[in-house]
Amino acid sequence: MTRDQAREKVIFALDTGEFAHVQYWAETLSDKVGMYKIGKQLFTACGPAAVRMIQKFGGEVFLDLKFHDIPNTVAMASVEAARMGVKLFNLHALGGYEMMAKTVEALDKEFKGGDRAKVLAVTILTSSTEETLKDLGIEHTVPDMVVRLATLARKAGIDGVVASPREIPLIREACGSDFLIVTPGVRPSFAALNDQKRVMTPAEAVKAGSDYLVIGRPIGDAPDPAAAAELILGEIVAG
């Protein structure tokens, strides 16, 4: 794998509420990462302006708002997300088949079957454990729930899933090679685990079959973020 191919796989998590930070990261990491993840904190603080700032510097956006509501509400919110020109956005698979299928239907109608943002379904959050599921009344194991939700998402026409690296082989087997897998819970060899439980290194996740890697603090908290990002690219290329 080349460095450019590795770069395209890296999504930097913009874990900030400050608009000024958006431009800083867009400039600092423009040749180090392929995409920027805008989550709830940043989007609540800055709104679509954060998306436009990334796009101004030629960056792609993964809008990580994890929609979960009644089907029509999620479908209409999804259309608005796609209209912003983001590359990826997501919703919760736990919202159910109808919510996901209606979203795909609304997007295909809006974009007439042409190019549009890819929709990802969140399976089980990487901070969740078996105990977390039991607290919610779910008796299945984490891997079983991930596969169940990924399969349901695929059936509804969703483009891929957000899932822990540990579940990549199971998802690939259940959903096929053309189903996108975006993996948080990726920690390079030089970084701490923080609050994510089911993790892999970038090289391990890519080897397992991940299409995109979401990485935040190992880059953002590093003394030299650009150098940290370059180290990660090196890990991926080296395999």
UniProtKB/Swiss-Prot annotation:
Substrate binds at residues 15, 37, 64-73, 126, 187, 196, 216-217. The active site is at residue 66. Coiled coil: none annotated. Its EC number is 4.1.1.23. GO terms for molecular function: orotidine-5'-phosphate decarboxylase activity. Homodimer. Catalyzes the decarboxylation of orotidine 5'-monophosphate (OMP) to uridine 5'-monophosphate (UMP). This is Orotidine 5'-phosphate decarboxylase. It comes from Geobacter metallireducens (strain ATCC 53774 / DSM 7210 / GS-15). The gene is pyrF.
